[in-house]
């Protein structure tokens, strides 16, 4: 659900000027008195200018500069830190986005939009347990914060804590019966436990409530994938993309299905469509790199260089991105035949990736092969595709 939820956060950005200095909130739970001094008027002016610039895709650098200036003038202006965090995250700079959102949360711990944005960034960085911890603390203090609780379901599921995720999804449904998004999230929890029939029933309920729910159609696609029906999954993801053209998650999922099928050129089209909406989306850049690598078959130098450049951009913004590290290692080792240059990427991947990550065995094999004077040739394999997203971007 990343992209759909992130769009909500981005909308909040435009309204961020209404609560300066601990005033009344218009989003999330009611604000409490923060004890902060009144906001510096010049800082507020720069923040407003930054938010205005952020609405123009060509003015992102200007927006970042203005928001940084607002923070320099008034370090306690949490709204500016929140806005800057959202702009940086939308630009793919997740590490710096997390820094700003952590600072905003420290200044304004009662703000739901800040807690949600911080947790979403942590999810996108692969830190699902940290995201869940952030949200668990928040909903404990704010039981009625449904956006935070719904994202908590996703974070817990991503962290493999399906029982806790199911309990939280039911809490959402108690407070908001028949909520289409909560039903779709609950379906994903049951799918994660291997209960595909239950997941299918819940998806049907979600679509009965809202037949145009992009989230529900994406979950339907994942249920089809779990049943081995890639064609039906692709159709469901296509419906999701039709219902929400600005949500790149469905494009990413279609790309992943096409990668699995070896349809590299068509997969590349889907990732390029996602990048047309979100030019710096890391998952789309990594997916496009994998598609180009597959399409090149190790022979098209131009495609391989484009793939390398895409992965390099992701790692420049987030050096800890495990998917980019692994894919760069595979590109260097298998496509460019540079095992010595691949080895550091695989080693960094092994340092960063969770112990249960499915690509760890291959990374370990590559590291061991690079250590040998005459490593055994690797068996040919399709490029690793980004796993279909559960309905995030994001």
Segments (PLM) and residue ranges:
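Bacterial signal peptide processing site
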Residues: 21-24
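Helix-start (N-cap) detector for alpha-helical repeat units in TPR-like alpha-solenoids
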Residues: 36, 42-44, 78-79, 112-113, ...
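Residue-level recognition of tetratricopeptide repeat
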Residues: 51, 86, 120, 154, ...
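Structural signature of tandem alpha-helical TPR/SEL1-like repeats
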Residues: 55-66, 90-103, 125-137, 159-171, ...
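Structural marker of alpha-solenoid helical repeat scaffolds
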Residues: 73, 107, 141-142, 175-176, ...
């Amino acid at each position: 659900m990343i992209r759909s939820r992130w769009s909500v956060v981005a909308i909040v950005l435009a309204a961020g000027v209404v609560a300066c200095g601990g005033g009344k909130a218009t989003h999330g739970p009611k604000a409490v008195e923060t004890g902060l001094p009144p906001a510096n008027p010049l800082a507020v002016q720069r923040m407003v200018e930054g938010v205005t610039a952020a609405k123009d895709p060509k003015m992102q650098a200007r927006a970042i500069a203005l928001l940084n200036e607002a923070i320099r003038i008034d370090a306690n202006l949490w709204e500016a830190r929140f806005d800057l965090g959202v702009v940086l995250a939308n630009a793919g700079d997740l590490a710096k986005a997390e820094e700003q959102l952590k600072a905003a949360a420290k200044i304004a711990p009662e703000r739901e939009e800040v807690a949600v944005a911080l947790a979403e960034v942590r999810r996108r960085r692969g830190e699902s347990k940290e995201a869940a911890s952030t949200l668990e603390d928040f909903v404990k203090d704010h039981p009625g914060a449904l956006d935070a609780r719904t994202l908590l379901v996703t974070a817990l599921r991503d962290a493999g804590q399906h029982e806790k995720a199911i309990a939280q999804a039911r809490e959402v449904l108690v407070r908001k019966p028949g909520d289409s998004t909560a039903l779709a999230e609950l379906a994903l929890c049951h799918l994660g436990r291997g209960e595909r029939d239950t997941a299918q029933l819940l998806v049907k309920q979600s679509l009965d409530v809202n037949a145009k729910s992009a989230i529900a159609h994406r979950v339907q696609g994942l249920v089809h994938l779990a049943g081995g029906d890639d064609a039906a999954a692709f159709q469901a993801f296509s419906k999701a993309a039709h219902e929400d053209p600005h949500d790149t998650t469905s494009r990413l999922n279609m790309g992943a299905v096409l990668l699995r099928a070896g349809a590299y050129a068509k997969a590349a089209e889907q990732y390029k469509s996602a990048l047309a909406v979100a030019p710096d989306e890391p998952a789309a850049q990594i997916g496009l790199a994998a598609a180009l690598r597959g399409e090149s078959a190790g022979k098209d130098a131009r495609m391989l260089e484009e793939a390398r450049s895409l992965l390099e951009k992701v790692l420049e913004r987030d050096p800890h991105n495990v998917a980019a590290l692994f894919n760069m290692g595979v590109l260097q080792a298998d496509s460019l035949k540079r095992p010595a240059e691949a080895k550091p990427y695989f080693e960094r991947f092994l340092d960063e990736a969770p112990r249960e990550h499915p690509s760890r065995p291959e990374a370990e094999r590559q590291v061991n092969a690079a250590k040998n004077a005459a490593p055994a040739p690797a068996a040919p394999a399709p490029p690793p595709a980004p796993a279909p997203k559960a309905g995030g971007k994001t």
